[in-house]
Amino acid sequence: MLAEVRGLNEECGVFGIWGHEDAAQITYYGLQSLQHRGQEGAGIVATDGKHLHGVKGEGLVTEVFTQKKVQELPGFGAIGHVRYTTAGGGGYENVQPLLFHSQSGSLALAHNGNLINATSLKHQLEGQGSIFQTTSDTEVLAHLIRRGGFGTMKDQVKHALSMLKGAYAFLIMTENELMVALDPNGLRPLSIGQLGEAFCVASETCAFDIVGAKFIRDVEPGELLIINKDGMRSERFSMATNQSICTMEYVYFSRPDSDIHGINVHSARKRSGIQLAKEMNIEADVVTGVPDSSISAAIGFAEATGIPYEMGLIKNRYVGRTFIQPSQSLREQGVKMKLSPVRGVVEGKRVVMVDDSIVRGTTSRRIVKMLKDAGALEVHVCITSPPIKNPCYYGIDTSTREELISASHSAEELRQAIGADSLTFLSVEGLIEAIGHEKQNSHCGQCLACFTGEYPTEILPDTMHPHDKELMC
């Protein structure tokens, strides 16, 4: 369903290109394809080999950039960013890419993820004389690079990356080089493509399709790619890797036409609907999915059960951005404005409502009420992921247990709270099976922490909400 009314949001998306005469224009198109990953800000920095030039602003890509602004960014290399605020707060100064100028040259950074040791590193750097211009955790990397004391930029970057903990997919650009880095756990998706002689990098492969690039491969955990006039080469900044891609990328965040580690997102969601149907028995008249991210799963559920699939809920695509706000009252109003039941489909019917997840419960409760007000006899809520009981510290805006309804309610209590006739969640094992990763480790290469509480990295105290610290004691 829509992030605007869900309150479950990815931090951002990144796109970069090197070796193309229209680098900024290609990046603009790439960012548009990643708009679902962040709607609060957008920016592009381009290089002509001598200088870095940037444009950024708050709002959607089309609100920040006119054609004239894009044309004011000449050069053969560019990086871009779309942002949803989860760490450091909003505001123009935190919109990325962040651009820094010094006597030794310029540096631009774009980041998807969340650094769980940013606070302690910032205190350490400030003690050494660093002055921070933003409240974004991304700026920490810039100061670490500049204070590295090593001879080459590559060595400075490697040393800086070795000090970071958490989730990060970084694009790092100077006047003459683009570097790409993914954290040792590979928590966020990042892929490499090729457009003619140019190299592209993006948070999702759907961006390559939009700009006409050919997918090459996914960036590996702990890998640093260096792209310049000599081509692209790969090095390691960490050998201690443990692939743990965020499972919610498949469940909700990524576009259905994207592939992550060779697995198509639409296909994974459809299989999750099929798997959920195998794990339960239900008698109903119609299956409907909550637009947009649950449509694939609903189709799979309908195919597996033989219950007809219908468009029982319609999304209003023309509501303004007033509701892209991180407040509960606007989320509730947003549900009403963004979704409408189709009375002719649900009236007098036993309805299976397929959705991808329940975070706070507000959305599910209001949709169930909508369907019943439209005449549904029964509403059976089927969730194609396990209950989300644990906060995410890796770049998703669920950083406290208090805001997760499944952390304090049983499935039956939650069913009563949302007013459903039944409520069923997909099992952890079923979700792993549906996604279909090779069993390369105990968690099949996925981060399942929001469901299981087993985090792939150490969770530092300064990352946690005070209430959650007490629970961990």
Identify the function of each model-found stretch.
Residues 65, 134, 139, 309-320, ...:
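A conserved beta-strand->alpha-helix junction
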Residues 159, 207, 214-215, 219-223, ...:
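Phosphate/diphosphate-binding loops
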Residues 1-221, 226-284, 290, 378:
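Conserved short alpha-helical segments that host acidic/polar catalytic motifs at enzyme active sites
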Residues 110, 173, 181-182, 193, ...:
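Generic beta-strand/beta-sheet core signal
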Residues 130, 150-151, 281-285, 303-310, ...:
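Secondary-structure transition/capping motifs at alpha-helix termini
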Residues 306-351, 362, 389-395:
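Short, glycine/charge-rich flexible loops or terminal/linker lids adjacent to PRPP-binding catalytic cores
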Residues 161, 176-177, 212-218, 369-473:
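PRPP-dependent phosphoribosyltransferase catalytic core
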Residues 20, 147-150, 197, 307, ...:
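Short, well-ordered loop/turn and helix-capping segments at boundaries between secondary-structure elements
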